[in-house]
Design a protein with these regions (language model features):
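Hydrophobic alpha-helical bundle segments that form small-molecule/ligand-binding pockets
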Residues: 120-126, 133-161, 198-202
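Hydrophobic alpha-helical connector segments
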Residues: 62, 76-107, 158-165
Length: 202
């Protein structure tokens, strides 16, 4: 289990190690990222690495947590506005635009980690599941607000709709990555809008 440092310099060192590992995993994948690679990128000693992380799996759990935090931070502003049709359209447009900026490479950082760590490390799987839970909760909160304002039908299930939206986006992100075509995500986004419009009161 990773150790949380008590001093500011210790916290900075641990964060530098996690950031280096997160960058390397995004660039090369988990299998191609060694602890020596991380130490070199982070300018950290072996003793510093093992002071905060018991082994490689422990570090990858921290990478999973860090990745989820970063994904939520990037979309925090647009997700907070996911409570009107206009806000939802802006959120979806921003999500597609980000993939266009990345030339349809990388996919969803959380989703990309799932296949690499979830089947052999329960701690990492739980960290990634928590990231998706937080994402889904943000979507659900906006939909609940729309139901309360009678912008969506009273029989709308915000929890189910949020799950459908997240699943659609993840599928779109995966197809965008493998086909190198952001139009895949745009098709998923259009499907999300159709789902929401079907629940509108007017």
């Amino acid at each position: 289990m990773s150790k949380q440092p008590r001093t500011a310099p210790g916290r900075a060192t641990r964060q530098r190690i996690v950031q280096a590992a997160t960058e390397l995993v995004a660039e090369r994948g988990v299998a191609a990222t060694s602890l020596d690679d991380v130490r070199e990128r982070a300018h950290a000693s072996k003793s510093q690495l093992y002071l905060y992380f018991s082994d490689r799996d422990d570090l990858m759990r921290a990478v999973s947590e860090s990745t989820c935090d970063a994904v939520m931070e990037v979309q925090s502003e647009s997700l907070a506005a996911f409570d009107s049709l206009e806000g939802i359209e802006r959120y979806l447009d921003a999500t597609v635009a980000l993939q266009e900026q990345r030339d349809a490479r990388g996919g969803c950082p959380i989703g990309s980690l799932v296949g690499q760590v979830a089947e052999h490390d329960e701690g990492a799987r739980l960290a990634l599941a928590d990231g998706f839970d937080r994402w889904e909760a943000g979507l659900r909160a906006g939909l609940e607000a729309m139901v309360q304002r009678c912008e969506l039908r009273a029989d709308t299930d915000p929890a189910l709709l949020a799950r459908q939206i997240l699943a659609s986006l993840q599928g779109g992100l995966l197809l965008t990555q493998v086909r190198r075509d952001s139009g895949q995500l745009r098709a998923a986004a259009d499907g999300v809008l159709a789902l929401i419009r079907a629940q509108r009161t007017a």
